[in-house]
Amino acid sequence: CIGSRAVTDRRKSTTDPIKEGAVAYQENDIMAGIAYLHNLAYTLSKPLVLCLGLGTNSGGHGGTSALSMLLSYVAAKRMRAVVVAAGNEANARRHYLGNLAPLQEYEDVEISVGDNIGGFTAELLTNSPEVVSVAVQSPTGESQPLIPARQGSSEEYRFLLEGTTVSISYSLGEFTRERELIFLRFTNPSKGIWRLRVYPENYVTSRYHIWLPVTEFVQGDIFFLRSNPETTITGPASAYAPISVGGFNASDDSLYLDSGRGYNIDNQVKPDFLAPAVEVFGPDLTFTKGHSFHR
């Protein structure tokens, strides 16, 4: 539009140990860039459109992360718009939807881990006020003792036969709208089928979600044997206020199968609309698929 300008803010890469060559940034650095652009637009009395082609499977999946809340704050202001890509995780097999039946003692969640995986994380979120506990079983059948859910509790267990270390941390309601968060970290996992045994501690609906890292962050094959393609929209596109954009194939008017799907964890309708995402010409006249840096 007349009088508009493009402002670029380059973010430094994250220092977290993820796949070599992955495009990744620390959340606090992204927030610093957003604050800079927001304040610059205010100083110049200009409208501002923020476009984020980044996504993650970490966090609350409902707009409760610090970045999501900042984007919602900016999006609510006059002369501001925030647009976020929905990610490409629908067919990545890195989301699991659990649904425990009444009186069911536990449910086994199977994760297939390939060769030469240095480590990975998994995040379990319940539907409030559900509370669950987890135990881990290795491919050789060695089991970690059940760790009951307690606010702030954290345990680490070493599987001797595999040489794998698993740490489990519980958080009840912290930054997740009173949801329980169980964070699991696997270090040097051996190849095979790892099992998370999920035990209900109180039964309400007994629905829960587990997410593995986005494809771009994982080196090797890690996926759920019984995955679920729904609720795969990445954060911060899962936040309520920002405009989240999914992808479709413009050549045949079909849904791009990898495009992140809703709803978010709070059953809010996401994404807001779809845009062409297959064989799209970029500025350097090359073809791309997807609609974020995580392809």
Q: Predicted segment positions?
A:
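Loop-rich non-cytosolic ectodomains and luminal regions
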Residues: 1-295
